């Protein structure tokens, strides 16, 4: 592997591990209509195709399936459902980048972080509100 052109090596084993994580999460078929069970019927070829495209730098994600779900407050929210294949590719990226980036994130960052939730952010905010009796408010204009 030439490290100057490929900063991350993607092994076939990593793609397989990513698939098992995606399978455990279940999920609906994407725009291609392929379920996890259908994907698994041709697992070896499907995983090889993902690995080959990602390793060669020519992976391009397919479109997502738009699904509208109702909001509790009224109205609708549009969700984008990726294909099983794209979920595996996304998981590969997550598994490579998360251990590298997690240590450099700010300790006050809670969104989409492992072991952190919005409830954790609320608890820290509540604690800080009780510890301080002042607020700094400002607006930045260009």
Predicted features and spans:
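Conserved catalytic palm subdomain of right-hand nucleotidyl-transferase polymerases, strongest
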Residues: 28-35, 80, 119-142
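Conserved, non-catalytic sequence blocks in retroelement Pol enzymes and Pol-derived host proteins
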Residues: 38, 81-84, 111-116
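Hydrophobic face of alpha-helices
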Residues: 40, 47, 89-90, 94, ...
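Short, compositionally biased low-complexity segments
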Residues: 11-27, 64-66, 95-100, 130
């Amino acid at each position: 592997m030439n490290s100057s052109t490929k900063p991350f090596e993607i092994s076939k084993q990593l793609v397989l591990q990513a698939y098992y994580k995606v399978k455990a999460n279940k999920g609906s078929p994407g725009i291609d209509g392929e379920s996890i069970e259908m994907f698994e019927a041709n697992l070896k070829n499907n995983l090889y195709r993902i690995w080959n495209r990602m390793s060669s730098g020519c992976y391009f994600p397919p479109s997502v399936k738009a699904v509208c779900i109702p909001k509790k407050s009224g109205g609708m929210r549009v969700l984008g459902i990726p294909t099983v294949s794209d979920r595996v590719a996304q998981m590969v990226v997550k598994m490579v980048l998360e251990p590298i980036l997690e240590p450099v994130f700010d300790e006050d960052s809670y969104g989409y972080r492992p072991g952190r939730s919005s409830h954790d952010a609320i608890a820290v905010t509540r604690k800080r509100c009780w510890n301080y009796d002042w607020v700094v408010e400002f607006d930045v204009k260009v």
